[in-house]
Amino acid sequence: METATLRPTHARLARLAGAYAGTESVYHEAGGAAGETTGRFRTNMGLGGNFLVIDYQQEQFGSITRLVHAVVGVDASSGRPTLHWFDDRGEDPGAPALGDWQGDDLVFERRTSRGAVRLAFGAPLSDGDGLTLRVDASADGATWSPALEGRYRRADWDRRTR
């Protein structure tokens, strides 16, 4: 059986692996209900280290308000990260979004039926225990507004269900 060759991008993705929890500020419906929320991530490298598998949940006022399952890989021809996004809204996930590293941030732009969304995952902070997420939304793909900003620390995964 032939296996894919791991690239330097895979090692960068592996830095994001772990369990995280933290506070989020939600500004726009694309990020959930406006206000303060708690976000939890569980991320791990799967399938021989070829993919970063992300499970995310958002909680507000004691209820789960958002669930996401995402898979980040590497495009074989370009070497760019790819994002496959699935959430509890049941929207057609469409084609994977292509991303780029901007410093320590992994940034994706994806189109949805509601417009464009830009996600920026911040690589763990210098102490290796932190993760950041910024989500911006745009109706026209030109003018962007903050939707969500979160700061997370390594934590036990305490997944609730709804």
Q: Where are the predicted features?
A:
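Hydrophobic small-molecule pocket/channel-lining residues, especially in calycin-type beta-barrels
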Residues: 1-162
